[in-house]
Amino acid sequence: MMAMNTETLSLIKQSIKTIPNYPKEGILFRDVTSLLENAAAYKAAIDLLVEHYRGQGFTKIVGTEARGFLFGAPLALELGIGFVPVRKPGKLPRATISQSYELEYGHDSLEIHTDAISANDKVLVVDDLLATGGTIEATVKLIRQLGGEVKDAAFVISLPDLGGEARLTALGLELVKLCEFEGE
């Protein structure tokens, strides 16, 4: 995790509610919407990411549908760079490319506008939560297919027991996580 003010990180973590048995029995769901409801915690999360990434030369932030938009867009605005959404199929109006990825049962895919990333772009990927890493792996493949350089990804929450951290570091990504929930 980032070397940051422990009091601020504690505020962020404590604002994330845990919902047992959602969406199915045996799952402890980490509800980032409760963080969004707490203006001080939401601002603290954005401010910590701004502080960490300011001056690192990023030219675009890519956020994954849909909660990645809630952290990626304000971060891009604060850093003075563009924000690029990665969405489920059929949601983007211009020409797109697509990347499929595996889910627990089946598969899904993500799309990005073909003109949203160029070979000169240094890209930061942002999402609310890192679990298995499948969504972010697909996102990274899209960015790289368009010629963008992506070596960093930021998350508000990480669930390290689900293997996403190892999966993404194997892709050469440096990860920033504001809080972790291990074995919980």
Curated annotation (Swiss-Prot):
Molecular-function annotations in GO: adenine binding; adenine phosphoribosyltransferase activity; AMP binding
* Localisation: Cytoplasm
**Any Pfam family:** Pribosyltran
Its pathway, per UniProt, is: Purine metabolism; AMP biosynthesis via salvage pathway; AMP from adenine: step 1/1
Catalytic activity entry: AMP + diphosphate = 5-phospho-alpha-D-ribose 1-diphosphate + adenine
Which SUPFAM superfamilies has this protein been placed in?
PRTase-like
Q: Has the keyword Transferase been applied to this entry?
A: yes
- Listed EC numbers: 2.4.2.7
* GO CC, any one term: cytoplasm
Q: Name one GO biological process term.
A: purine ribonucleoside salvage
Q: From what superkingdom does this record's organism come? A: Bacteria
- Give UniProt keywords alphabetically: Cytoplasm, Glycosyltransferase, Purine salvage, Transferase
Q: Which PANTHER family match?
A: ADENINE PHOSPHORIBOSYLTRANSFERASE
Q: Tell me, how does this one assemble?
A: Homodimer.
Q: Which family does it belong to?
A: Belongs to the purine/pyrimidine phosphoribosyltransferase family.
Give the protein's function. Answer: Catalyzes a salvage reaction resulting in the formation of AMP, that is energically less costly than de novo synthesis.
Q: What is this protein called?
A: Adenine phosphoribosyltransferase
Lineage, uppermost ranks? Bacteria, Pseudomonadati, Pseudomonadota, Gammaproteobacteria, Alteromonadales
